[in-house]
């Protein structure tokens, strides 16, 4: 069995685990608010940002200076002691880094292009900053590791797949530990891109709400240290699938998502009735919430409490999988109440197939949580975490 030895996280809920746990319990995200300068033709857009100072990247790593890598360092700092112990125990060549991202340092590239367009000097930009492989390369260099290091980019399931890949490397005997997770930061291109697709909500996103109008984009980073060393929280099972149906729309019957969840349950040797909570992908787009409701209804009916936390973190794109898996771990680790779905801006959509969406916080009845990530292109990943004796 693969265990989660440590976790670090930063997003609109807070800059460390204590802040995130407190605000998750309150149902309040300090970083979620209207922000200016991001959406072309609009004075403001509701975005979920990270506030406060971030770690500086020294001159030695100047080619990797991006906000994406800064928030990765902020997440890493929260599990640095456990990472140091793993390096001492296993050696630098026996630790992998597998990360997920959708945009990497795209914001820095965008800033560079704007400066050059207006014939202004651009002195801090390096091409490596916007490469998709840069987050894992940077972290590997930062920690002076010699094990496998690579980045996955499968849209919104990127970091969920990074968790699965890290587990696979350990099970294959290629490494003894894996630092897994991902990061994405606010960037004008995806914000304006989702707006052009009519998928960016003009207000705070409303997952499973009647008047839902699209996603709220957020930024964040999360990291987990996976090992075989027994810990209170384990990675019980995983599942992956591809719809092979459409470039952006999910399969109309959720066939790929159902396969991913069933794979995870089979891998964990569990049944749907063993699951105590489902952290839904719940993006608040019309199609995602409709299809995910079909999927959850088909497999779990209304028996299992579920909710989306994207009204608190925003959709952190490539970091969504690690963000929601880490939130699930926090619930298990600290016995937090399950986060309720907020229907204050829009009533629940009565046309969606019924599932166990909770509207008030409640305790976790069974110590197993399913975290789903269903990405563009039908790229699906499901992860089961649980407390173990």
Question: Residue ranges of each PLM-predicted region?
Answer:
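Structural signature of cysteine-dependent C-C bond-forming condensing enzymes
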Residues: 85-96, 114-124, 138-148, 171-178, ...
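Conserved small-residue
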Residues: 6, 24, 97, 139, ...
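Glycine-/small-residue-rich "gating" segment that lines the acyl/pantetheine channel
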Residues: 120-123, 164, 185-231, 245-247, ...
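Conserved beta-ketoacyl condensing-enzyme motif
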Residues: 4, 32-153, 272-288, 303
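Condensing-enzyme catalytic core mediating Claisen C-C bond formation in acyl metabolism
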Residues: 2-5, 17, 22-36, 42-44, ...
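Glycine-rich phosphate/pyrophosphate-binding beta-alpha loops
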Residues: 12, 103, 155, 285, ...
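ACP-dependent fatty acid/polyketide chain-elongation machinery
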Residues: 1-62, 228-236, 326-341, 386-389
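Active-site pocket-shaping loop/turn-to-helix segments
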Residues: 58-78, 123-131, 149-161, 206-222, ...
